[in-house]
Amino acid sequence: MNNLILVKYASEIFLKGLNKNKFERKLKENIRKKLKDIDHEFITDQNRWFIKSEDLDGVIERVKKVFGVKELCLVTQVTGDFDSIKEEGLKKIKESKAKSFKVETNRANKKFPMNSMEVSRAVGGYILSELGDEIEVDIHNPECKLYVEIRGNAYVFTDKDKIKAVGGLPYGMNGSTMVMLSGGIDSPVAAYLMARRGVETHCVYYHSHPYTSERAKDKVKELAKIVGRYTEKITLYVVPFTEIQMDIIEKCREDELTIIMRRFMMRVACELSEKKKIQSITTGESIGQVASQTMEGLIVSNDASDRPVFRPLIAMDKEDIMDIARDIDTYETSILPYEDCCTIFVPKHPKTKPRVKDMIIAERKLDIEALVNKAIDEMETFIFE
């Protein structure tokens, strides 16, 4: 008998029709990359994926963070004869110390002489005969569910052997995006959610030295690293933004500062995406959360972009965003008290209902192309793997 890890991928992949094989191949490739320095064997048994390794804990810790993997199960592989299935089932139930149980069988191997219902009844009957009054069957609300998978071999496990994974779609299957990453709570969550949908994720951070410190930059680098744990690698572009901000402050109205700065961030992200062949922009904006994120503000920001702008948090409450941040381990880093370029030079009364035509007129005082190109020419690049 061997202990293996059963890999269950997101049910959405089953719905991909003729593209299903592409998604499966990409998911396998991503799993293997995650396990490149762990000795393991990838086993396929009648469309089920299993991983064999001496370091099962290490495999679980990494594979549960692979986008596209829905669930991992620590299973025991037994020979296909029925006695070994019954004995392993009995052992699992004893280990669970449950007072009630239920058996569920998936018989994919149609050559096996019993159907799924017959296997469940026979295994359950054997357990009852061995344990007597210690346990009972409860098909509605059992303390322990015993699962039997019959394929080329047979596999036995319980619901206590299941580990929830991140789900989503295989990373790298759905194009690419440039995430405008700040040091706050929202944008790392937006980056994670886009990556979870299979979108190759890159990040740009706007640094306002000397008004923002090196610790603020280090904080954003750490956030990129954390998001990068879920991806193959992640690239962070650090763009100097001070000159742009000072020019805007000097030449534009105070109540328009925030939205014009936001439009410049969009332009820089778009120009950088053009150079790096990245298809879209992603932000951590949520409708109505701050003054620049009114419907009118978002429309004016979008006007400065020549690419699709995705906002995965757009209709989420702050509490929901914070819950995800905690789940993915970005929250504690995000709340470190270092200011970013979005929190300095904030006007007392920012315009909440800006108009595109007004911003275009205001920006005529600025050399947009020169400012954007100079910022990109002076940027730093960090790659985290």
Swiss-Prot record:
It is an enzyme of class 2 (transferase). PROSITE patterns: THUMP. GO terms for molecular function: ATP binding; CCA tRNA nucleotidyltransferase activity; tRNA binding; tRNA-uracil-4 sulfurtransferase activity. Keywords: ATP-binding, Cytoplasm, Nucleotide-binding, RNA-binding, Thiamine biosynthesis, Transferase, tRNA-binding. One of its GO terms (cellular component) is cytosol. It comes from the Bacteria. It catalyses: [ThiI sulfur-carrier protein]-S-sulfanyl-L-cysteine + a uridine in tRNA + 2 reduced [2Fe-2S]-[ferredoxin] + ATP + H(+) = [ThiI sulfur-carrier protein]-L-cysteine + a 4-thiouridine in tRNA + 2 oxidized [2Fe-2S]-[ferredoxin] + AMP + diphosphate; [ThiS sulfur-carrier protein]-C-terminal Gly-Gly-AMP + S-sulfanyl-L-cysteinyl-[cysteine desulfurase] + AH2 = [ThiS sulfur-carrier protein]-C-terminal-Gly-aminoethanethioate + L-cysteinyl-[cysteine desulfurase] + A + AMP + 2 H(+). Pfam families: ThiI, ThiI_fer, THUMP. Residues 57-160 form the THUMP domain. Coiled coil: none annotated. Pathway: Cofactor biosynthesis; thiamine diphosphate biosynthesis. It is found in: Cytoplasm. The keyword Isomerase does not apply. One of its GO terms (biological process) is thiamine biosynthetic process. ATP binds at M180, L181, Y205, Y206, R262, G284, Q293. Its EC number is 2.8.1.4. InterPro entries: Rossmann-like_a/b/a_fold, ThiI_AANH, ThiI_fer, ThiI_N, THUMP_dom, THUMP_ThiI, tRNA_STrfase, tRNA_sulfurtransferase_ThiI. Catalyzes the ATP-dependent transfer of a sulfur to tRNA to produce 4-thiouridine in position 8 of tRNAs, which functions as a near-UV photosensor. Also catalyzes the transfer of sulfur to the sulfur carrier protein ThiS, forming ThiS-thiocarboxylate. This is a step in the synthesis of thiazole, in the thiamine biosynthesis pathway. The sulfur is donated as persulfide by IscS. Belongs to the ThiI family. This is Probable tRNA sulfurtransferase. The lineage of its organism: Bacteria, Bacillati, Bacillota, Clostridia, Eubacteriales.
